[in-house]
């Protein structure tokens, strides 16, 4: 007989675990999510080509990132409009933040720069001798919509992202700004 599990059973199971086990599950779930994203992309690419796969990926990320931002904000008890500080807090809670080393630079009330120090996708391609994956259009949709969901005043600019040239110690970098005339006093 196959056991049945309710959502409550699963929640109770998670509460029974110690902190280290929970952290391992969170990291492993993030890896599984990214593996699914990559396999999905490869399936679309195999059937429809790279350009179509990138466009489908861009559209999917544009939508997913809004869902992700809203859920993070709800979990943190945030409302839209919290500025750069709210964005930086939300970025720490993204699935990607559990997998890719990142750095925040030049943080102020009106500006921050996020640098992706390592990227599991790009590093895997490099290990396989493949060229950088040209993810700039996807990243721009992803980061712009995430930031705009956190605070509609935030504007996003890509500093560098493949296929752009980038320093060896980073894969991509994104600038988030709130125009000075829209900053709260």
Could you tell me what each predicted segment is?
Residues 1-113, 120-138, 148-173, 179-185:
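N-terminal accessory segment detector
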